Amino acid sequence: MSDVWGYTDETGIEYAIVGYQNGTSIINISEESPIEAGNIIGPSTGDYYFHRDYKTYGDFLYIVNEMYGGDIGMQVIDLSPLPHSPPIQLQTYNYIGQSHNLWIDPSGYAFIEHQSGDNIHIADLSNPSSPTYYGTFGTQAQNCHDIFTQDNIAYVSEGWSNQFGIYDISNLNNITQLAIIPCQGYAHNAWTNTDGNILVTTEETDGMTIKIWDIEDFDNINLIGEYLGENNLAHNVHIKENFIYISHYTTGIKIIDIFNPTYPVEVAAYDTYLENDLGGFFGCWGAYPFTENGYIYASDMQYGLYVLDFNEVNAGWVNGHIYFNNTIPFENTSIRSILNNKVYYTNNNGSFDIGFPSGNHMFIVNEQDTIQINFLPHQITTQDIFIGNELIPGDINQDTLIDILDVIIIINIVLNNYEPSNQEFWVSDMNFDGIINIQDIILIVQLILDN
């Protein structure tokens, strides 16, 4: 399967719209067992991925594709016969050929990525059953791969131009550039929040993060947050309320809370691709979160359509310090989540800053001590944590024994071959004079001999 979209008919029945090799399947998902309510045949010759993209406008579905053979162009489908009769293809708008992506603005214009002509093609949907040619972006927004519009602003992902373009489309006869955001990868897809002050972008390039931009001022755009899943390759993002919904290829679908956009937090995930979490263009292609019943549709290229239920979980953020023996900062040490095995670290003064799904969660510090941290929904709180048994002077490696291993460590400290942590310094300073030297070595050796 390729991309996925959704539609709700006049009776409230909801449908998933998904692409496959020979066309488009329209699936009634309101039943316990989803059933196909319509099948639209389309061009079927092309590459392995069967690129198809969908948007709806009222009771009409518009389909573009990158395939060959058959009637090439934008298919116009009347969905109003549902649920009693199958949808009907009215025509193919053939002012364009192959296309990877389209977007329909609420004002009634379709913006279509045009692979073989005018780049971004604009169609007028005043009569939605019979689109007419309106115009283009001209020489602007070249190499368009994806387009999204909101509030008379177009956000164009400009592919191998390595940039995301922002354009004023309030006058379609005089489209003007407002800003450019350069990127190092392939500018693949972009989406804004409802307020239009946050833009999230993907680059569909191995190792390139999903980026969160503050676009409150187009003259002063700033990168404020980043995220990337385990496979290091993301496909597309959509935003609904405070959540980013990511089709993340082999790791499936990811849901990220951006209530605090400077610290995005993964709050839910579902692995649609069962083979592995390695890189590569396999797995989850599309994610559609805009259903009325709260379900999420996910299309997986190998495993088909998933209908998922998200019991909304908000993120919380906790910062503080971890102390050993009540006063000594536990510096540069691991804090591993028992829930998902993710590892965080304290810095060199023992402080930590963790974002996590809300609730009480258990962590293991330094692979030794189990602690509990309480994350409150959409709140930033402070929690200092005190762990461990009392530190024993001379037990530098903290194995509860004072032996030759500790002598080796303190000798290396004195010779400046090893930089001790706060804990190690405290237990090495045997005479508590604030200096580690030969006197401390002698005192540790004396302890060993006495024992």
Please provide the spans of the model-predicted regions.
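Feature marking well-ordered beta-strand scaffolds used for ligand recognition
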Residues: M1-N326, Y344
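Acidic, divalent-cation-chelating loop motifs in proteins
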Residues: D124, D168, D257, L391-L401, ...
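Short, acidic Ser/Thr/Gly-rich low-complexity loop/linker segments typical of extracellular
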Residues: P329-F330, S337-P357, I373
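A short, solvent-exposed beta-strand micro-motif common in secreted/extracellular proteins
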Residues: S358-D369
